[in-house]
UniProtKB/Swiss-Prot annotation:
Compartmental location: Periplasm
Top class in the EC scheme: oxidoreductase
Catalyzed reaction equations: L-methionyl-[protein] + a quinone + H2O = L-methionyl-(S)-S-oxide-[protein] + a quinol; L-methionyl-[protein] + a quinone + H2O = L-methionyl-(R)-S-oxide-[protein] + a quinol
Similarity comment text for this entry: Belongs to the MsrP family.
Cleaved signal peptide residues: 1-57
Gene name of this polypeptide: msrP
Protein name, entry field: Protein-methionine-sulfoxide reductase catalytic subunit MsrP
GO molecular-function terms, A-Z: metal ion binding; molybdopterin cofactor binding; oxidoreductase activity, acting on a sulfur group of donors, quinone or similar compound as acceptor
Keyword terms of this UniProt record: Metal-binding, Molybdenum, Oxidoreductase, Periplasm, Signal
GO cellular component: periplasmic space
A Pfam family reported for this protein in Swiss-Prot or TrEMBL: Oxidored_molyb
Cofactors required: Mo-molybdopterin
Post-translational changes noted in the entry: Predicted to be exported by the Tat system. The position of the signal peptide cleavage has not been experimentally proven.
Gene Ontology terms describing biological process: protein repair
Length: 331
Protein backbone atom coordinates (compact mmCIF):
# COMPACT_ATOMS: atom_id res chain seq x y z
CA UNK A 1 0.00 0.00 0.00
CA UNK A 2 1.30 3.44 -0.93
CA UNK A 3 1.70 5.60 2.15
CA UNK A 4 1.06 9.30 1.58
CA UNK A 5 3.87 11.50 2.87
CA UNK A 6 3.32 14.35 5.24
CA UNK A 7 4.91 17.66 4.28
CA UNK A 8 7.34 17.36 7.19
CA UNK A 9 8.41 13.88 6.12
CA UNK A 10 8.81 14.96 2.51
CA UNK A 11 11.02 17.88 3.41
CA UNK A 12 13.14 15.63 5.61
CA UNK A 13 13.53 13.05 2.87
CA UNK A 14 11.59 10.38 4.75
CA UNK A 15 9.45 7.89 2.87
CA UNK A 16 7.13 7.09 5.75
CA UNK A 17 5.48 9.11 8.52
CA UNK A 18 7.21 9.45 11.88
CA UNK A 19 4.30 7.57 13.45
CA UNK A 20 5.29 4.53 11.37
CA UNK A 21 8.99 4.51 12.34
CA UNK A 22 8.53 5.42 16.00
CA UNK A 23 7.26 3.21 18.84
CA UNK A 24 3.67 4.21 19.66
CA UNK A 25 4.45 5.35 23.22
CA UNK A 26 7.24 7.59 21.93
CA UNK A 27 5.08 9.02 19.14
CA UNK A 28 2.24 9.91 21.52
CA UNK A 29 4.68 11.48 23.99
CA UNK A 30 6.19 13.61 21.20
CA UNK A 31 2.75 14.73 20.06
CA UNK A 32 1.83 15.95 23.55
CA UNK A 33 5.10 17.88 23.78
CA UNK A 34 4.56 19.48 20.36
CA UNK A 35 1.07 20.56 21.36
CA UNK A 36 2.46 22.21 24.48
CA UNK A 37 5.23 23.82 22.43
CA UNK A 38 2.64 25.55 20.28
CA UNK A 39 1.70 27.75 23.20
CA UNK A 40 5.33 28.34 24.11
CA UNK A 41 6.08 29.61 20.61
CA UNK A 42 3.90 32.65 21.21
CA UNK A 43 6.18 33.59 24.09
CA UNK A 44 9.35 33.40 22.03
CA UNK A 45 10.68 30.14 23.49
CA UNK A 46 11.12 28.54 20.09
CA UNK A 47 13.66 31.19 19.21
CA UNK A 48 15.61 30.35 22.35
CA UNK A 49 15.66 26.69 21.37
CA UNK A 50 16.97 27.66 17.96
CA UNK A 51 19.81 29.58 19.56
CA UNK A 52 20.64 26.57 21.73
CA UNK A 53 20.96 24.32 18.69
CA UNK A 54 22.98 26.92 16.78
CA UNK A 55 25.66 26.67 19.46
CA UNK A 56 26.61 23.27 18.00
CA UNK A 57 27.42 24.53 14.52
CA UNK A 58 31.12 23.76 15.11
CA UNK A 59 33.23 21.95 17.74
CA UNK A 60 33.16 23.63 21.14
CA UNK A 61 36.30 25.72 21.60
CA UNK A 62 35.98 25.34 25.38
CA UNK A 63 35.58 21.55 25.40
CA UNK A 64 38.49 19.35 26.45
CA UNK A 65 40.51 18.38 23.41
CA UNK A 66 41.74 14.84 22.84
CA UNK A 67 45.00 14.02 21.10
CA UNK A 68 44.18 10.91 19.11
CA UNK A 69 45.88 9.86 15.87
CA UNK A 70 43.65 8.61 13.08
CA UNK A 71 43.74 4.85 12.60
CA UNK A 72 44.08 4.26 8.84
CA UNK A 73 42.43 0.84 9.15
CA UNK A 74 39.16 2.46 10.09
CA UNK A 75 38.18 5.04 7.52
CA UNK A 76 35.11 5.44 5.33
CA UNK A 77 35.40 6.70 1.73
CA UNK A 78 32.39 8.93 2.30
CA UNK A 79 31.79 12.46 3.48
CA UNK A 80 31.97 12.85 7.25
CA UNK A 81 28.76 14.17 8.76
CA UNK A 82 29.00 17.72 10.09
CA UNK A 83 29.57 18.38 13.78
CA UNK A 84 26.29 20.27 13.85
CA UNK A 85 24.28 17.33 12.54
CA UNK A 86 26.07 14.84 14.79
CA UNK A 87 25.31 16.92 17.88
CA UNK A 88 21.79 18.17 17.13
CA UNK A 89 20.12 15.11 15.57
CA UNK A 90 20.14 12.48 18.29
CA UNK A 91 18.18 9.71 19.95
CA UNK A 92 18.74 9.89 23.69
CA UNK A 93 15.34 9.42 25.30
CA UNK A 94 16.64 10.18 28.77
CA UNK A 95 16.50 13.80 27.59
CA UNK A 96 13.38 13.66 25.43
CA UNK A 97 11.94 11.91 22.42
CA UNK A 98 12.46 14.55 19.74
CA UNK A 99 15.72 14.53 17.78
CA UNK A 100 16.58 18.04 19.02
CA UNK A 101 15.77 17.37 22.69
CA UNK A 102 19.19 15.98 23.71
CA UNK A 103 21.06 19.03 22.39
CA UNK A 104 18.63 21.39 24.13
CA UNK A 105 18.25 19.53 27.42
CA UNK A 106 21.42 17.52 28.09
CA UNK A 107 23.17 20.46 29.74
CA UNK A 108 21.86 19.08 33.03
CA UNK A 109 24.07 15.98 32.71
CA UNK A 110 27.16 16.09 34.92
CA UNK A 111 29.85 14.03 33.12
CA UNK A 112 32.53 14.74 35.71
CA UNK A 113 33.15 13.25 38.19
CA UNK A 114 32.04 9.94 36.70
CA UNK A 115 32.66 6.32 37.58
CA UNK A 116 32.12 3.10 35.67
CA UNK A 117 31.73 -0.12 37.65
CA UNK A 118 33.05 -3.23 35.90
CA UNK A 119 31.59 -6.24 37.64
CA UNK A 120 30.15 -9.72 37.39
CA UNK A 121 32.02 -12.73 36.03
CA UNK A 122 35.51 -11.20 36.15
CA UNK A 123 38.60 -11.92 38.22
CA UNK A 124 39.46 -8.25 38.64
CA UNK A 125 36.29 -6.23 39.22
CA UNK A 126 37.02 -2.55 39.40
CA UNK A 127 35.43 0.88 39.53
CA UNK A 128 37.08 3.16 36.99
CA UNK A 129 37.12 6.92 37.33
CA UNK A 130 36.58 8.56 33.94
CA UNK A 131 40.06 10.10 34.08
CA UNK A 132 41.54 6.63 34.62
CA UNK A 133 39.59 5.31 31.64
CA UNK A 134 41.05 8.06 29.48
CA UNK A 135 44.51 6.71 30.28
CA UNK A 136 43.72 2.99 30.15
CA UNK A 137 44.86 2.53 26.54
CA UNK A 138 46.11 4.71 23.68
CA UNK A 139 43.32 6.75 22.14
CA UNK A 140 42.71 6.72 18.41
CA UNK A 141 40.27 8.25 15.97
CA UNK A 142 38.11 5.94 13.90
CA UNK A 143 35.68 7.07 11.24
CA UNK A 144 32.67 4.76 11.37
CA UNK A 145 29.30 4.60 9.69
CA UNK A 146 26.36 4.86 12.08
CA UNK A 147 23.10 3.29 10.91
CA UNK A 148 19.95 3.94 12.93
CA UNK A 149 17.18 1.35 12.97
CA UNK A 150 14.85 4.19 11.89
CA UNK A 151 16.42 4.26 8.43
CA UNK A 152 18.91 7.14 8.63
CA UNK A 153 22.69 7.18 8.86
CA UNK A 154 25.77 9.30 9.55
CA UNK A 155 29.55 9.03 9.19
CA UNK A 156 31.24 9.94 12.47
CA UNK A 157 34.88 10.41 13.61
CA UNK A 158 34.80 8.78 17.05
CA UNK A 159 37.69 8.73 19.54
CA UNK A 160 38.34 5.87 21.92
CA UNK A 161 40.06 2.52 22.22
CA UNK A 162 38.99 -1.09 21.64
CA UNK A 163 36.69 -2.37 24.35
CA UNK A 164 38.86 -5.49 24.32
CA UNK A 165 41.59 -3.50 26.09
CA UNK A 166 39.35 -3.05 29.11
CA UNK A 167 38.09 -6.62 28.97
CA UNK A 168 41.61 -8.04 29.02
CA UNK A 169 42.42 -6.07 32.16
CA UNK A 170 39.45 -7.31 34.17
CA UNK A 171 40.00 -10.95 33.08
CA UNK A 172 36.56 -12.47 32.48
CA UNK A 173 35.99 -15.93 33.93
CA UNK A 174 34.98 -18.93 31.82
CA UNK A 175 31.38 -18.21 32.85
CA UNK A 176 31.33 -14.82 31.11
CA UNK A 177 29.32 -15.28 27.91
CA UNK A 178 27.81 -11.82 27.50
CA UNK A 179 28.55 -8.21 28.40
CA UNK A 180 25.81 -5.88 29.60
CA UNK A 181 26.04 -2.07 29.48
CA UNK A 182 23.92 0.02 31.84
CA UNK A 183 23.28 3.73 31.33
CA UNK A 184 22.93 6.33 34.08
CA UNK A 185 19.33 6.85 35.25
CA UNK A 186 19.22 10.00 37.37
CA UNK A 187 16.00 12.04 37.13
CA UNK A 188 17.78 15.11 38.48
CA UNK A 189 20.06 15.07 35.44
CA UNK A 190 17.85 13.40 32.85
CA UNK A 191 14.41 15.01 32.49
CA UNK A 192 13.25 12.47 29.94
CA UNK A 193 13.16 9.72 32.56
CA UNK A 194 9.75 11.01 33.62
CA UNK A 195 8.29 9.60 30.39
CA UNK A 196 7.20 5.95 30.79
CA UNK A 197 8.68 4.83 27.49
CA UNK A 198 11.19 2.21 28.61
CA UNK A 199 12.02 0.47 31.85
CA UNK A 200 14.93 2.59 33.04
CA UNK A 201 17.88 2.39 33.32
CA UNK A 202 18.64 1.83 29.66
CA UNK A 203 20.62 -1.34 29.10
CA UNK A 204 22.20 -3.09 26.14
CA UNK A 205 24.28 -6.19 25.64
CA UNK A 206 26.71 -8.05 23.41
CA UNK A 207 27.94 -11.58 23.11
CA UNK A 208 31.48 -11.93 24.41
CA UNK A 209 32.97 -12.41 20.94
CA UNK A 210 31.16 -9.26 19.76
CA UNK A 211 32.50 -7.29 22.69
CA UNK A 212 36.03 -8.51 21.95
CA UNK A 213 35.80 -7.75 18.23
CA UNK A 214 38.42 -5.15 17.17
CA UNK A 215 35.66 -2.87 15.83
CA UNK A 216 33.90 -2.47 19.17
CA UNK A 217 35.05 0.87 20.53
CA UNK A 218 34.88 2.20 24.08
CA UNK A 219 34.30 5.79 23.08
CA UNK A 220 35.05 9.01 24.92
CA UNK A 221 35.25 11.59 22.14
CA UNK A 222 34.14 12.82 18.73
CA UNK A 223 35.52 15.42 16.33
CA UNK A 224 38.71 15.84 18.37
CA UNK A 225 37.06 16.61 21.70
CA UNK A 226 35.36 14.83 24.59
CA UNK A 227 31.85 13.62 23.91
CA UNK A 228 29.16 16.31 24.14
CA UNK A 229 26.51 15.38 26.67
CA UNK A 230 23.89 14.66 24.03
CA UNK A 231 26.19 12.14 22.34
CA UNK A 232 26.58 9.96 25.41
CA UNK A 233 29.15 11.72 27.59
CA UNK A 234 31.43 10.88 29.14
CA UNK A 235 31.74 7.29 27.90
CA UNK A 236 29.77 5.08 25.56
CA UNK A 237 30.29 2.05 23.38
CA UNK A 238 30.18 2.08 19.57
CA UNK A 239 29.31 -1.13 17.71
CA UNK A 240 29.31 0.00 14.06
CA UNK A 241 27.87 -3.12 12.42
CA UNK A 242 24.73 -2.97 14.57
CA UNK A 243 21.84 -0.52 14.63
CA UNK A 244 22.60 2.55 16.69
CA UNK A 245 20.50 1.68 19.74
CA UNK A 246 22.96 -1.13 20.51
CA UNK A 247 25.65 1.49 21.23
CA UNK A 248 24.83 2.37 24.84
CA UNK A 249 25.50 5.92 26.05
CA UNK A 250 26.60 7.46 29.37
CA UNK A 251 27.61 4.08 30.77
CA UNK A 252 27.86 3.56 34.53
CA UNK A 253 28.07 -0.26 34.63
CA UNK A 254 29.71 -2.90 32.47
CA UNK A 255 28.56 -6.26 33.71
CA UNK A 256 29.85 -9.68 32.62
CA UNK A 257 27.15 -12.35 32.80
CA UNK A 258 26.64 -16.01 31.98
CA UNK A 259 23.44 -15.65 29.95
CA UNK A 260 21.88 -13.25 27.49
CA UNK A 261 20.98 -10.10 29.47
CA UNK A 262 17.69 -8.25 29.08
CA UNK A 263 18.08 -5.19 26.87
CA UNK A 264 15.80 -2.16 26.75
CA UNK A 265 14.36 -2.12 23.24
CA UNK A 266 14.25 -5.89 22.93
CA UNK A 267 12.25 -6.02 26.16
CA UNK A 268 9.94 -3.25 24.93
CA UNK A 269 9.16 -4.87 21.56
CA UNK A 270 10.98 -8.17 20.95
CA UNK A 271 9.32 -8.67 17.56
CA UNK A 272 10.71 -5.32 16.34
CA UNK A 273 14.10 -4.94 18.03
CA UNK A 274 16.15 -8.12 18.18
CA UNK A 275 18.93 -8.76 20.65
CA UNK A 276 21.50 -8.93 17.86
CA UNK A 277 20.15 -6.07 15.70
CA UNK A 278 22.89 -6.40 13.11
CA UNK A 279 22.44 -4.02 10.19
CA UNK A 280 20.82 -6.20 7.54
CA UNK A 281 19.15 -4.85 4.38
CA UNK A 282 17.52 -8.26 3.84
CA UNK A 283 15.60 -8.28 7.12
CA UNK A 284 12.99 -5.55 7.32
CA UNK A 285 11.58 -4.01 10.45
CA UNK A 286 7.93 -5.14 10.74
CA UNK A 287 6.82 -1.61 9.84
CA UNK A 288 9.40 -0.45 7.28
CA UNK A 289 12.12 -1.56 4.92
CA UNK A 290 15.77 -1.68 5.96
CA UNK A 291 17.04 -1.96 2.37
CA UNK A 292 17.86 1.74 2.05
CA UNK A 293 18.79 4.68 4.25
CA UNK A 294 18.89 8.47 4.30
CA UNK A 295 22.24 10.10 5.09
CA UNK A 296 21.68 12.99 7.49
CA UNK A 297 22.90 16.31 6.09
CA UNK A 298 23.18 14.99 2.54
CA UNK A 299 20.10 13.13 1.32
CA UNK A 300 17.01 15.24 0.81
CA UNK A 301 13.59 14.72 -0.75
CA UNK A 302 14.85 14.68 -4.34
CA UNK A 303 17.88 12.50 -3.61
CA UNK A 304 17.43 8.75 -4.03
CA UNK A 305 18.08 6.90 -0.80
CA UNK A 306 21.33 4.96 -0.68
CA UNK A 307 21.42 1.20 -0.35
CA UNK A 308 22.13 -0.15 3.11
CA UNK A 309 25.20 -2.38 3.31
CA UNK A 310 25.16 -5.77 5.00
CA UNK A 311 26.63 -5.39 8.49
CA UNK A 312 26.82 -1.66 7.64
CA UNK A 313 29.79 -2.43 5.39
CA UNK A 314 31.83 -4.24 8.07
CA UNK A 315 31.24 -7.81 6.93
CA UNK A 316 34.94 -8.59 6.53
CA UNK A 317 35.37 -7.92 10.24
CA UNK A 318 32.26 -9.54 11.68
CA UNK A 319 30.48 -11.94 9.32
CA UNK A 320 32.37 -14.98 10.61
CA UNK A 321 30.81 -14.52 14.07
CA UNK A 322 27.39 -15.32 12.62
CA UNK A 323 28.32 -18.15 10.28
CA UNK A 324 25.61 -20.79 10.29
CA UNK A 325 23.07 -18.60 12.09
CA UNK A 326 19.66 -17.85 10.62
CA UNK A 327 19.86 -14.05 10.58
CA UNK A 328 16.13 -13.72 10.02
CA UNK A 329 15.51 -15.64 13.22
CA UNK A 330 18.38 -14.10 15.18
CA UNK A 331 17.77 -10.58 13.93
Amino acid sequence: MLIKKTLRAALAGDDIPRSEITPRAVFEHRRRILQAAGAAAAGGLVGAHGLALAAYASPDATARKLAAPANPKFVVPEKVTSFKDITTYNNFYEFGTDKSDPARRAGTLRPHPWRVSVEGEVRNPKVYDIDALLKLAPLEERVYRLRCVEGWSMVIPWIGFPLAELIKRVEPTANAKYVQFVTLADPSQMPGLSAPILDWPYSEGLRMDEAMNPLTLLTIGVYGQVLPNQNGAPVRVIVPWKYGFKSAKSIVKIRFVDRQPPTSWNTYAPNEYGFYSNVNPNVDHPRWSQATERRIGEDGFFTPKRKTLMFNGYGDWVASMYRGMDLKKYF
